[in-house]
Amino acid sequence: METHIKTVEFERPNMLAEAQSGASCVAHAWAKVPPALSREERDALKARIKRLLKERNAVLVAHYYVDADLQDLAEETGGCVSDSLEMARFGRDHSAKTLVVAGVRFMGETAKILSPEKTVLMPDLDATCSLDLGCPPDTFAAFCDAHPDRTVVVYANTSAAVKARADWMVTSSIGLKIVQHLHEQGQKILWAPDRHLGSYIQQQTGADMLLWQGSCLVHDEFKGVELDLLRAEHPHAKVLVHPESPPSVVAQADVVGSTSQLIAAAQSLPADAFIVATDNGILHKMRMAAPGKRFIEAPTAGNSATCKSCAHCPWMAMNALTNLAEVLETGRNEIHVDPQIGQQAVRCITRMLDFAAREKTTVRPQGDLAANTQLFQGVGPA
């Protein structure tokens, strides 16, 4: 296949610099993670949150990467535990007047864009995303202006302002199909922000893609050399990889897919053990979906003392029972999206939703498990 990958170097803020103040600094994000609670404290908070959800006519929507207690609480109260797009869909379609989003800020923004009439709260407004931070709206707009001949396709993990500049928003499971569709129409793509996901999609489709050079703090730390050593220790384990991971990791995958797709693989594939290269928050749902199977965390670069994420997003970890209860009691931490930006951003989201409704397709598994493609029907993001 002829390749048409282009990358560009440009000056932009180092949003992950250790010296930076605020929760965009990784060290500061970890410092904001609430302390562990006793069983008694957790049970008391859960009971309090359940009462507050009813009193506020609110529903809890949580991502697969947040604390297991929050995932369980969402399901126990009629909420939703899913990927970011399904979180927004669920909130849009639910009758609750208040959506409480346990995740990171772009998820709350997307929920607000799709449900502008509803109140959207988050446990901590500082819970952000390295992909979002690494794609500043003004710099991105200038980048787009410099390449007016390209169709702008952005990943869900971006701010509302970046989405407002895009022609399409995609998720990790529908991105392949949308880019293939655009490629067949002869369109050249400007892709942002994740370079690994963009490279993976380009290699699968052959599209002409200009890649923004962003990456996920968690997935970028998975390394092919360490994974190869772990596979030697567990030769019968299947490898599940999120496509935000580096190419050396994706190349070793039995299944490449979004969070929902990897959970489906863990549940449905005939294997007793899986090596999982994505945020370890997903392991709670995988163990629930496949209780008789073993899940092994893929190693990250500099495991233990020197890793930045150690396979868990520090901003996802900022969501906890304590600040969830506080936000329900006070009504603070409300997500606001400028109406003009929201009206512009909703177009690229709706375009993807309409396309997905027509296509009902997903990222295809790689390698030995290609025959299991039918297991991964549906649309869901990171």
Curated annotation (Swiss-Prot):
Molecular function GO labels: 4 iron, 4 sulfur cluster binding; metal ion binding; quinolinate synthetase A activity
InterPro entries hit by this protein: NadA, NadA_sf, Quinolinate_synth_A_type1
Keywords, in A-Z order: 4Fe-4S, Cytoplasm, Iron, Iron-sulfur, Metal-binding, Pyridine nucleotide biosynthesis, Transferase
Pathway it works in: Cofactor biosynthesis; NAD(+) biosynthesis; quinolinate from iminoaspartate: step 1/1
Catalytic activity entry: iminosuccinate + dihydroxyacetone phosphate = quinolinate + phosphate + 2 H2O + H(+)
Presence of keyword RNA-binding: no
E.C. designation(s): 2.5.1.72
Transmembrane segments: none
Functional description taken from the UniProt entry: Catalyzes the condensation of iminoaspartate with dihydroxyacetone phosphate to form quinolinate.
NCBIfam families attached to this UniProt entry: nadA, PRK09375.1-1, PRK09375.1-2
Protein name listed in UniProt: Quinolinate synthase
Source organism per UniProt: Ralstonia nicotianae (strain ATCC BAA-1114 / GMI1000) (Ralstonia solanacearum)
